[in-house]
């Protein structure tokens, strides 16, 4: 196939760097955030006020990390740098100053790809979207249906302040959801006189009722107000004026306890039209008075006061890595402060040094906790490059300080008009997290306040000005403008052609003449996320199916020989490049050396730049990471040129699947209910073969009875089972292993109690110690097989960090090639997913007029009800492209080039393809897009023409090999004695309540009985049944299930006299099969208790 790619539509501009969100945020943390925290934190004074410790934040430094990224991954270490900061200890009495550089902890560093390496695993810190600090006005209806208004002042950290109106026109205030207090009591406590307040209000007559109410309660002075405030906030403690003063001061006016943040100050100033400087981060009297004034205006419906919509993106902000890390550092420093104060008090004042005061542990622990166990620090999804990229651009409303799944209602999850161009309306999970986890739209970026912005071109006098950089607007700024969509038609000078243009203005749609338009969107793709923008013709798909398509592209397994799509959208190159999977040239120059492992580019000055390639490494999801060079020796390269393909990339473009020939027709019921019928060609030609690498690990520990040993000398194992082990007992690289094979031989010392009776007898007779060890080797689990590709041995002598108690750790990596097979899940890019039901020989597949057999047969009934017609456009456009020997790029939302443009373009290409010599049959004008196929088994034509074409189909990570599972005998749960569940535990299938009903409905009494007893938790019964089966005897009657005995015991332990009786009233002893020698009944009865006493 030739490499010419035809561009059907041009996007306006290149996309921004797609991982910028992560990198910019971490850069801000290193340059500003960390310094800010260290400086806010000092000085620390001891309780007597003699000593002061200052942290000089601007002079902090980071040492070079101990390991580089690759080394850290290999050693299971963290890629981190040591932080040092200059501390100054000032003795106020003597004036002595001691200055010293102090180690304050390790800080994990971000790699170039926007990830962190924590304990050898790549992790991503997901961005969190939370309610922005500021002031919010809401209305509520009371019990009588009357509207009341309230205002909440929400800080970044500190106490919430909420003002409310009631039906008597009184104003109340709550601090942190405590009891209501008359608002004027708070004013008086803050030291404001009645006139101070009244002068600030535009409608003071409403407020005078609250003043009157305060006077009626007998609270007329500041001192009385402070006492009242203390009583309400600290009920049960003896109130005092000084206590009230201190409480108020620390709650709202102390910068250490109360912080609006830069954003909160900006939002309050904007909403209340104040001009308080950015540096004032606490509440001021002006804030409180303006809030009351605004609330009264709302109540009286004057002065243009408006309510706030908390789901509007102007009121929600993104907290990225930098800020989340900054908050965590603050937690650590607060813990550190307590320790320092204690040490200052305890230690000898003269001999103290900063290094003795500062203990790095609390800070280290706080940072470690954040990276290791925070909800927002996630194991990176490395299934393929797209999954990796999307994970870094994810925005979650969950996590600390955010929402919980249960609490989140429909309003939070819903698409909001302000999401346009900021959050993708399509890409979100299905299920309980729908709408809480979103993806950043393609062109969106996060500004310094944490609000999401999206770019526009300015429009002046009806002319779009595409000069220089586009203008970025946040959601609340955009509301004030009239914004036209990105697909408006313009002439070559940029003049808008139509007479009336649909625009968005204040979250509504109107039509205005071009002269009134303020801005035009940059590109039609900017509304959707990266994954969605890779779906061609997405505008013809129902949103639910586009959602599935976006999510399933992230689950595509990288194939052995990837192939880029015939029909793409033009974003494939950028996705591959920004995912970090493909090495890129940093300079202009010439390739001077290429092999499978490395590429050297020599720049024009003669400097050499080495690019190491990843070879067959295991990803977090057990898929295979591998890079293949695509440049040759002597090639000239420029900055930004792709030098090698990563996994699921071809020619520098992302290639998640294969282009295969697809026919939409039923075939003998094998594609009923979304099943897929495939040709043997996909198996034989390795079209959908992927490499998976499993990691197996074993550690030799120190036990009470002595150390475990990794060895070849394993008791009771035949020599042929040890054939592939080396002299240490570790499998050799290159060996082929199957389930049950030994990978690493290990023996554990065993105590006296572990010895079977025959061994005890032998020892008694011969007095010789049989080797007191038991086999505890690492074996290949059931259903797994493959080739050993790598073995790594970690010991303390080599300087590796091992888990406590371990002397040696051995890791074995086993790779397997998985061909496609029945039961594997496949999908297109339009949410058309299915399971392979049968693999047919090539000669039995339906074939085209030129004799080509099709690769996949899909059910046509999968299209109409699901309304994902984009797959049909892709199919036919792919058919045309394959016959024209080219590749096509189609940008989504192509109506700007005219109505029905997709339809016209596809038709045009098909006609073009049919003009090729010998290809007249490719397009039949009477039945456009369909061909007459013949049955491969009989050679007869099918009665109806069939839609045939090339589509990009993916193999998903849900492989049948990982899911298929069977159990004959296996482990049981300790308490209930029922089989464990799940493949990993070698478990059984759960027979739940509804399955029992099904068996009851058919009267299958014996089947049901043995499922509930012999096959589950009747301990004696199952042993007897197994014996009977082995010996070929009839299976005996089942006994009592263990779970019934547990239930009886629980009821008896509640003091209930419960027993099981036969029809004749004779008590049945449930416990008799447990201990046959026991004479007492299964529970104490009066008779048995009496007999016990007589024996005594």
UniProtKB/Swiss-Prot annotation:
EC number(s) per entry: 2.7.7.6
BP GO terms, sorted: DNA-templated transcription
Alphabetized InterPro entries for the sequence: DNA-dir_RNA_pol_bsu_ext_1_sf, DNA-dir_RNA_pol_bsu_external_1, DNA-dir_RNA_pol_su2, DNA-dir_RNAP_su2_dom, DNA-dir_RNAP_su2_hyb_sf, RNA_pol_bsu_bac, RNA_pol_bsu_CS, RNA_pol_bsu_protrusion
Gene source species: Prochlorococcus marinus (strain SARG / CCMP1375 / SS120)
Region (Disordered): 1069-1096
Complexes and interactors: In cyanobacteria the RNAP catalytic core is composed of 2 alpha, 1 beta, 1 beta', 1 gamma and 1 omega subunit. When a sigma factor is associated with the core the holoenzyme is formed, which can initiate transcription.
Keyword Nucleotidyltransferase belongs to the record: yes
Gene Ontology cellular-component annotations: DNA-directed RNA polymerase complex
Gene Ontology molecular-function annotations: DNA binding; DNA-directed RNA polymerase activity; ribonucleoside binding
Name of the protein in its database record: DNA-directed RNA polymerase subunit beta
The entry's keywords: DNA-directed RNA polymerase, Nucleotidyltransferase, Transcription, Transferase
Protein's job: DNA-dependent RNA polymerase catalyzes the transcription of DNA into RNA using the four ribonucleoside triphosphates as substrates.
NCBIfam families, per the entry: PRK00405.1 (NF001616), rpoB (TIGR02013)
Stated family: Belongs to the RNA polymerase beta chain family.
Catalytic activity: RNA(n) + a ribonucleoside 5'-triphosphate = RNA(n+1) + diphosphate
Transmembrane segments: none
PROSITE patterns assigned to the protein according to its UniProt record, in alphabetical order: RNA_POL_BETA (PS01166)
Top-level EC class as recorded in UniProt: transferase
């Amino acid at each position: 196939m030739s490499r010419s790619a035809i561009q059907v539509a041009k996007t306006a501009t290149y996309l921004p760097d797609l991982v910028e969100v992560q990198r910019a945020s971490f850069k801000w943390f290193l340059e500003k955030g960390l310094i800010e925290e260290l400086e806010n934190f000092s000085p620390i004074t001891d309780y007597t006020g003699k000593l002061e410790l200052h942290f000089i934040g601007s002079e902090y430094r980071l040492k070079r990390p101990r390991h580089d990224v690759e080394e850290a991954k290999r050693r299971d270490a963290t890629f981190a740098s040591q932080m040092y900061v200059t501390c100054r200890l000032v003795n106020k009495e003597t004036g002595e100053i001691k200055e010293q550089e102090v180690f304050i902890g390790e800080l994990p560093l971000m790699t170039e790809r926007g990830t962190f390496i924590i304990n050898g695993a790549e992790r991503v810190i997901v961005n969190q979207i939370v309610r922005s600090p500021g002031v919010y006005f809401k209305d509520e209806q009371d019990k009588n249906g009357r509207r009341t208004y309230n205002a909440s002042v929400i800080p970044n950290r500190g106490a919430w302040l909420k003002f409310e109106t009631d039906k008597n026109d009184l104003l109340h205030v709550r601090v942190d959801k405590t009891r209501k207090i008359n608002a004027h009591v708070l004013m008086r406590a803050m030291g404001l006189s009645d006139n101070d307040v009244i002068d600030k209000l535009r409608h003071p007559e409403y407020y005078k009722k609250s003043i009157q109410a305060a006077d009626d309660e007998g609270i007329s002075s500041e001192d009385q107000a402070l006492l009242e405030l203390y009583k309400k906030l600290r009920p049960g403690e003896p109130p005092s004026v000084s206590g009230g003063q201190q409480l108020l001061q620390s709650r709202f006016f102390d910068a250490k306890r109360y912080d609006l943040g830069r954003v909160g100050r900006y939002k309050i100033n904007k909403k209340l039209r104040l001009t308080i400087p950015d540096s004032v981060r606490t509440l001021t009297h002006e804030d409180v008075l303006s809030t009351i004034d605004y609330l009264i205006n709302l109540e009286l419906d004057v002065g243009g006061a408006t309510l706030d919509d908390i789901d509007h993106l102007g009121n929600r902000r993104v907290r990225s890595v930098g800020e989340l890390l900054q908050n965590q550092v603050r937690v650590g420093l607060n813990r550190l402060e307590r320790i320092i104060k204690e040490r200052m008090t305890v230690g000898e004042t003269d001999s103290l040094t900063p290094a003795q005061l500062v203990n790095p542990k609390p800070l280290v622990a706080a940072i470690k906790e954040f990276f290791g166990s925070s909800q927002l620090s996630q194991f990176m999804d490395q299934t393929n490059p797209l999954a990796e990229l999307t994970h870094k651009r994810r925005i979650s409303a969950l996590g600390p300080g955010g929402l919980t799944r249960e609490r989140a209602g429909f309003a939070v999850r819903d698409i909001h008009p302000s999401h346009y161009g900021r959050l993708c309306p399509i890409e979100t999970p299905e299920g309980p997290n729908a709408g809480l986890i979103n993806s950043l739209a393609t062109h969106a970026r996060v500004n310094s306040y944490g609000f999401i912005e999206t770019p526009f071109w300015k429009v002046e006098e009806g002319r779009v000005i595409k000069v220089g950089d586009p203008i970025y607007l946040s959601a609340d700024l955009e509301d004030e403008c009239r914004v036209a969509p990105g697909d408006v038609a313009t002439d070559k000078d940029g003049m808008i052609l139509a007479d009336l243009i649909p625009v968005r203005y204040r979250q509504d749609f109107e039509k205005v003449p071009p002269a009134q338009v303020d801005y035009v969107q940059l590109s039609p793709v900017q509304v959707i996320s990266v994954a969605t923008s890779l779906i061609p013709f997405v505008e013809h798909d129902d949103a639910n199916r586009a959602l599935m398509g976006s999510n399933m592209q992230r689950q595509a397994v990288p194939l052995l020989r990837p192939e880029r799509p015939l029909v793409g959208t033009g974003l494939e190159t950028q996705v591959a490049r920004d995912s970090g999977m493909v090495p890129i040239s940093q300079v202009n120059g010439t390739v001077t050396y290429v092999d499978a492992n490395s590429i050297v580019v020599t720049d024009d000055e003669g400097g050499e730049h080495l690019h190491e390639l990843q070879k067959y490494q295991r990803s977090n999801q057990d898929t295979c990471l591998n890079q293949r060079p695509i440049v040759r020796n002597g090639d000239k390269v420029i900055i930004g040129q792709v030098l090698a393909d990563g996994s699921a990339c071809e020619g520098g473009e992302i290639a998640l699947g294969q282009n295969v020939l697809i026919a939409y027709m039923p075939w003998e019921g094998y594609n009923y209910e979304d099943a897929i019928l495939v040709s043997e060609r996909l198996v034989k030609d390795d079209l959908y073969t992927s490499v998976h690498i499993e990691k197996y690990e074993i550690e030799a520990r120190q036990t009470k009875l002595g150390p475990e040993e990794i060895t070849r000398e394993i008791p009771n194992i035949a020599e042929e089972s040890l054939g592939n082990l080396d002299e240490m007992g570790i499998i050799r690289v290159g060996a082929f292993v199957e389930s049950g094979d030994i990978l690493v031989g290990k023996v554990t010392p065993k105590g006296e109690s572990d010895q079977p009776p025959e061994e005890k007898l032998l020892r008694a007779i011969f007095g010789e110690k049989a080797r007191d060890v038991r086999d505890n080797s690492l074996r290949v689990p059931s259903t797994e097989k493959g080739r050993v590709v790598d073995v790594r041995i970690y010991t303390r002598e080599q300087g590796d960090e091992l888990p406590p108690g371990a002397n040696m750790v051995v890791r074995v990596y086993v790779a397997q090639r998985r061909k496609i097979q029945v039961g594997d899940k496949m999908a297109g890019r339009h949410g058309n997913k299915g399971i392979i039901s049968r693999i047919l020989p090539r000669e039995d597949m339906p074939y085209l007029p030129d004799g080509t057999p099709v690769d996949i047969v899909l059910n046509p009934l999968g299209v109409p009800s699901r309304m994902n017609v984009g797959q049909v456009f892709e199919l036919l456009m792919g058919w045309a492209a394959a016959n024209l020997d080219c590749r096509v790029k189609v940008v989504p939302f192509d109506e700007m080039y005219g109505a029905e443009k997709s339809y016209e373009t596809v038709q045009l290409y098909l006609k073009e393809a049919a003009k090729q010599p010998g290809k007249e049959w490719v397009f039949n004008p009477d039945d456009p897009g369909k061909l007459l196929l013949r049955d491969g088994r009989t050679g007869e034509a099918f009665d109806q023409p069939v839609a045939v074409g090339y589509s990009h189909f993916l193999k998903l990570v849900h492989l049948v090999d990982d899911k298929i599972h069977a159990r004959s005998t296996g482990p049981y749960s300790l308490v209930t004695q029922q089989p464990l569940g799940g493949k990993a535990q070698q478990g059984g299938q759960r027979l739940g309540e509804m399955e029992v009903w099904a068996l009851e409905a058919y009267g299958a009494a014996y089947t049901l009985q043995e499922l509930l007893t012999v096959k589950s938790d009747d301990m004696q019964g199952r042993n007897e049944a197994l014996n009977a089966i082995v010996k070929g005897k009839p299976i005996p009657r089942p006994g009592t299930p263990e779970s019934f005995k547990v239930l009886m015991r629980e009821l008896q332990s509640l003091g209930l006299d419960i027993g099981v009786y036969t029809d004749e009233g004779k008590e049945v002893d449930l416990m008799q099969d447990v201990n046959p020698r026991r004479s007492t009944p299964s529970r104490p009865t009066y008779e048995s208790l009496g007999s016990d006493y007589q024996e005594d």
